[in-house]
């Protein structure tokens, strides 16, 4: 039973007495009767005195007063799941849910439109049906749903996905530590080969205290031939400012890149937080695509910092789970192949046209010092302010300014919602700069952005944009360089191996930049995407170009993909081009349908094939097998074998991943060049959370997380997750919760021990950004007992209510032959039985169970009520 107020009916099989059917029949008839209903006690017992007071059923009441955990449904949409107090309004009206004006307002009822609500006390039960015409409240006992129907005119007008701030939860106080370690050890058979060992550790630590979030992000790395190095990527104190729909940050952060280029800073910033907006009003996140020619290490950097690192198999890859440290700023993607060669390219990351809903104001104010990880740049103080306003007729007006010792900039822009023709924005920036050689420059930059979705054709122009800058235009970052040209090395980089992607020359300022991102759905024929960018410079013909194309389709159970990647950076003599063909085929379709491993469990097996050809005609081919194991599908392995036409060498790899309760682990082995180069790679990630109820180990943390507290429900699976269970105390952390959104947290009741019952199997939470929200589950660990009750040798009265002393939420009803079923009973206790309100209509059952009885599926026993 998953409700706070428990009323256990009796089992009807295996010789166990059942709740008398006559009561159900007559109660149902009573609800449909037009005249006053009366139950004849003689129908239930020959002796009417042996029947409890049934007056509540005569009034059409299916429940007794008390607190019930119910789903609240407003106009056929679930808006909340919580405890609701059901009270007796009057003897004539009977029992109803007590809904206060405050709770109705939080659900989305426009109480301000009805003055009668304002006249009620905040904690008083509001007569909804009397105040709002045509409104009704119905309690579905069988489904534990409180169904509220209100005319649409009485509902607040909110955007799709809106959750009222009254439901936002700041979470509990806690210490947080997330870690991610990866390493690789190379073994070379050649005596003159160097070792290629590398290690990388990322630590995300923090403290939550009320609405405040203290965070630190640090990394440790070591590679062969280099000393180990710690880096402090960022440290900051942050909190939500809910009345302003914004966020206050003190410490290290990044400015938004909507107007000016995103820069890293150390200081103070107050800015709007789009996470507080409904999903329908939010933008998009970057997706990084590419093609690896071998088992490769993928490193993604933003603003000079490594924000993502992983290992991929040969073929096309797509990374969509990047947690960027900034809302903007191009991403530098480095693909390090098994032979040590590195291919790099830049992926533009910008916002779609800067439109806001009418009346909305989006703001950001920053007072800080410029922060850099480059040895070529200096740090100086600057100020920045931006503002957007959603005007009438689908317009958005925006502007901003930057001020520093050697830099002044102001920009102004206007966006239009063109309806069926999409959305556009246009802005101009005027800047005055003083460079490293003390030369002064003035210039302008013009930008145009366009976005459109053609629903009829399935085409989505996620982003099309063009920026043109005059030769005298520079950015704030340009004025921070100590020299006019050079190679931009970050702390810890190998300065003996400069890369063109890190070369800068302030004489060659940016001129024009074109970028496009288009996707097209082809119905049952699949889909394709096209993305690209081109950056030109003043005083040179050199350009940066990136073009990516892909097509994916499904032919029955066969998944087929074709992709092409072209990239060229200025100074790079030749472009890098790679064409790839890949497919995957599920193998479990070939296995018996009756095989439990592939029907009732989360186990899958599939074969993959990847073929790629570069611009020099070199071909790589790989064939692989992947399978998931264990009941929860949290163990997987992958085996691949490949061939490279360049040098006619063979390569292969094998890896295994385990997603556990306390951590995620991975180990892999790969070889190339016919075995002359071999590498062992491994990774371990997880978290540690210290809170008022103890210390909990878990999987990797997200930005926002949920702590499950279910004492008594140890080793219970978390629904809709992989490898996630409660620990030996009944606690676990559910990572990657969505801030300011409804998060449904559920335990899998089927995985409970047989002597454990849950009052609530589902908890809905709405965390604020960075919060650790507590989701409490009330578990009753105890015996399931079927008692044959009596008092002075006579069975207890039919319909009497029995309640476990000290646990008012654990109750049951006496059956027609005096039987009582209750679950979650401790080894020893007292049960109070009532069959009326008079002082003599009560008795008590004292019981004591053996260990064998506690562990039994159901214990049958006689019980005397005194």
Curated annotation (Swiss-Prot):
GO term, biological process aspect, one: pilus assembly
Localisation: Cell outer membrane
Signal sequence coordinates: 1-35
GO molecular function annotation: fimbrial usher porin activity
Membrane topology of the entry: Multi-pass membrane protein
Keyword match Signal: yes
InterPro entries, sorted: Fimb_usher (IPR000015), Fimbrial_membr_usher_CS (IPR018030), FimD_plug_dom (IPR042186), PapC-like_C (IPR025949), PapC-like_C_sf (IPR043142), PapC_N (IPR025885), PapC_N_sf (IPR037224)
Induction: Induced in the presence of epithelial cells.
Keyword Transport: yes
Gene3D superfamilies noted in UniProt: 2.60.40.2070, 2.60.40.3110, 3.10.20.410, Outer membrane usher protein FimD, plug domain
Gene Ontology CC: cell outer membrane
Keywords on record: Cell outer membrane, Fimbrium biogenesis, Membrane, Signal, Transmembrane, Transmembrane beta strand, Transport
UniProt family annotation: Belongs to the fimbrial export usher family.
Function statement: Part of the elfADCG fimbrial operon, which could be required for adherence to host epithelial cells. Could be involved in the export and assembly of the ElfA fimbrial subunits across the outer membrane.
Database matches in PANTHER family: FIMBRIAL USHER DOMAIN-CONTAINING PROTEIN YDET-RELATED, OUTER MEMBRANE USHER PROTEIN
Protein known as: Probable outer membrane usher protein ElfC
Lineage: Bacteria, Pseudomonadati, Pseudomonadota, Gammaproteobacteria, Enterobacterales
């Amino acid at each position: 039973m998953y409700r706070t107020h428990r009323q256990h009916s009796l089992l009807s099989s295996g010789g166990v007495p059942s709740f008398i059917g006559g009561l159900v029949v007559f109660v149902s008839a009573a609800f449909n009767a037009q005249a006053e209903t009366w139950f004849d006690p003689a129908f239930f017992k020959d002796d009417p005195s042996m029947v409890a007071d049934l007056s509540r059923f005569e009034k059409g009441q299916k429940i007794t007063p008390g607190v019930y955990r119910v789903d609240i449904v407003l106009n056929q949409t679930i808006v909340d799941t919580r405890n609701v107090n059901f009270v007796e309004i009057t003897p004539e009206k009977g029992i109803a849910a007590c809904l206060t004006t405050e709770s109705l307002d939080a659900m989305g009822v426009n109480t301000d439109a009805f003055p009668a609500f304002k006249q009620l006390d905040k904690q008083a039960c509001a007569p909804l049906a009397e105040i709002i015409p045509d409104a009704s409240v119905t309690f579905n006992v069988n489904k534990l749903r409180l169904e509220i129907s209100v005319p649409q005119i009485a509902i607040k007008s909110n955007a799709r996905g809106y959750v009222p701030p009254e439901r936002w939860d700041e979470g509990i106080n806690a210490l947080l530590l997330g870690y991610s370690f990866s390493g690789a050890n190379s073994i070379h058979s050649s005596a003159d080969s160097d070792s290629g060992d590398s290690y990388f550790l990322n630590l995300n630590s923090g403290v939550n205290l009320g609405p405040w979030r203290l965070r630190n992000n640090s990394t440790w790395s070591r590679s062969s031939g280099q000393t180990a190095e710690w880096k402090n990527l960022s440290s900051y104190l942050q909190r939500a400012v809910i009345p302003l729909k914004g966020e206050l940050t003190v410490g290290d952060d990044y400015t938004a890149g909507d107007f000016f280029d995103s820069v890293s800073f150390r200081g103070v910033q107050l800015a709007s937080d789009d996470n507080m907006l409904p999903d329908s009003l939010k933008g998009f996140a970057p997706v990084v695509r590419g093609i690896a020619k071998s088992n490769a290490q993928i490193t993604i950097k933003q603003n000079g910092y490594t924000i993502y690192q992983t290992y991929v198999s040969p073929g096309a890859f797509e990374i969509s789970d990047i947690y960027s440290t900034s809302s903007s700023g191009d991403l530098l993607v480095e693909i390090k192949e098994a032979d040590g060669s590195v291919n790099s390219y830049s992926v533009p990351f910008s916002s779609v046209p800067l439109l806001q809903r009418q009346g909305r104001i989006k703001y950001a104010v920053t007072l800080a010092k410029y922060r850099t990880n480059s040895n070529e740049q200096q740090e100086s103080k600057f100020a920045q302010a931006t503002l957007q306003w959603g005007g009438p007729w689908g317009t958005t007006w925006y502007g901003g300014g930057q001020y520093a010792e050697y830099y002044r900039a102001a920009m102004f822009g206007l966006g239009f919602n063109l309806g069926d023709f999409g959305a556009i924005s246009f802005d101009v920036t005027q800047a005055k700069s003083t460079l490293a050689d003390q030369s002064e420059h003035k210039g302008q930059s013009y930008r145009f952005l366009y976005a459109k979705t053609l629903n009829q054709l399935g085409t989505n122009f996620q982003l099309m944009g063009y920026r043109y800058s005059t030769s005298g235009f520079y950015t704030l970052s340009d004025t921070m360089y100590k020299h006019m040209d050079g190679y931009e090395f970050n702390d810890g980089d190998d300065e003996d191996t400069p890369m063109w992607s890190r070369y800068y020359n302030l004489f060659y300022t940016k001129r024009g930049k074109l970028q496009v991102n288009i996707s097209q759905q082809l119905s049952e024929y699949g889909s394709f995407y096209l993305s690209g960018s081109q950056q030109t410079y003043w005083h040179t013909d050199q350009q940066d170009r990136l073009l990516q194309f892909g097509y994916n389709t499904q032919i029955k159970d066969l998944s087929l993909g074709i992709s092409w990647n072209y990239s060229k950076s200025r100074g790079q003599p030749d472009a890098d081009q790679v064409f790839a063909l890949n497919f995957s085929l599920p193998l479990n379709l070939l296995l018996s349908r009756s095989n439990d491993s592939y029907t009732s469990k989360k186990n899958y097996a599939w074969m993959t094939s990847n073929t790629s050809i570069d611009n020099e005609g070199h071909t790589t081919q790989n064939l692989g097998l992947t399978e998931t194991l264990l009941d929860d599908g949290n163990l997987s392995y992958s085996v691949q074998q490949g061939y490279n036409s360049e040098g006619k060498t063979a390569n292969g790899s094998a890896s295994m991943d385990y997603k556990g309760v306390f951590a995620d682990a991975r180990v892999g082995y790969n070889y190339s060049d016919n075995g002359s180069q071999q590498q062992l790679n491994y990774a371990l990630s997880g978290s540690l959370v210290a809170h008022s109820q103890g210390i909990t180990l878990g999987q990797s943390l997200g930005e926002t997380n949920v702590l499950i507290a279910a004492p008594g429900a140890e080793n219970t699976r978390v629904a809709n997750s992989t490898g996630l269970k409660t620990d030996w105390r009944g606690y676990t952390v559910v990572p990657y919760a969505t801030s300011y959104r409804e998060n449904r947290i559920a335990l899998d009741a089927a995985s409970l021990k047989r002597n454990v019952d849950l009052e609530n199997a589902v908890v809905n939470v709405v965390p604020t950004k960075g919060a650790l929200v507590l989701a409490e589950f009330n578990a009753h660990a105890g015996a399931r007992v079927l008692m044959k009750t009596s008092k002075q040798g006579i069975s207890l009265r039919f319909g009497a209510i029995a309640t476990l002393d000290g646990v008012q939420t654990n109750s049951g009803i006496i059956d027609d032959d005096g039987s009582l079923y209750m679950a979650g009973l401790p080894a020893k206790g007292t049960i109070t039985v009532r069959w009326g309100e008079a002082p003599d209509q009560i008795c008590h059952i004292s019981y004591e169970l053996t260990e064998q009885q506690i562990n039994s599926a159901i214990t049958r026993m006689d019980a005397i009520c005194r």
